[in-house]
Amino acid sequence: KTRGAARFVQDNPANAIYIRCTPVGGTLTAMLRQLGTALKLPATRNRLELSMAIHDRLKGTDKVIIIDEAQNLRFDALEELRSLSDPDDLTGESGTGICLIGNSEVYSRMLGKQEAQFAQQFSRVRFRRRYSTADVKLADVEKLFPTLADGSHGKELAFMTGVCRSKWGIRGAMSVYTNAVRNENTSLDGLRGIAASMGVGVLS
């Protein structure tokens, strides 16, 4: 997820804003400050002024805001992001695109499995799509690990696909492979050994 977001930002530097939300950065104030910094706005301690400045700066642009680790966002921060995506009441002009990247917690919260307020908020999102590591395909894994996609590493690719689809996801798979490379053994046994030492399981 993070690698995909980073690639999108690299390919679209003028139109993409990337923010990583840490556990202490999920408050409305922290989120506004990160957005303000990304948009090169003057620093201010007044949240209303900063919010208005962000809205003004984004108005009429074709930017997309990508929030990584979005499960750390508080409700009021999510509500502020939703307001950025709303169309202009007077002109009908489209709002800013918002992409939330996180674990299944943020999706469950937005669906209302934990809090009704998130369900109400989620129902106002007009275009929603969920992507999960369980949807990772062999073709995706071949692109992530091209050295294994030479036609002679089918078992290794299948193993890495299982890691990608597990709760450790693509990030866990990347860690397993990186450590296997450092260990100079990317064979199936080498990958399995590294995964076992890291406590990483696999979905078959």
Language-model segment annotations:
Residues Q10-V24:
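Conserved catalytic segments around the Walker B and adjacent sensor/switch elements
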Residues L73, D86-F118:
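Sensor-1/coupling segment of RecA-like P-loop NTPase cores
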Residues T44-K63:
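Conserved alpha-helical scaffold flanking the Walker A/P-loop in AAA+ ATPase domains
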Residues K1-F8, V24:
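Walker A/P-loop nucleotide-binding motif
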Residues P23-G26, N72, G102-S108, D135-L138:
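Conserved nucleotide-binding/hydrolysis micro-motifs of P-loop NTPases
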Residues R57-A77, L81, D88:
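Conserved P-loop NTPase "ATPase switch" module shared by AAA+ and STAND
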Residues A16-Y18, T27-R45:
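Conserved NTP-binding/hydrolysis module of P-loop NTPases
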Residues A6-Q10, A119-S123, F127, S132-S204:
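C-terminal alpha-helical "lid" subdomain
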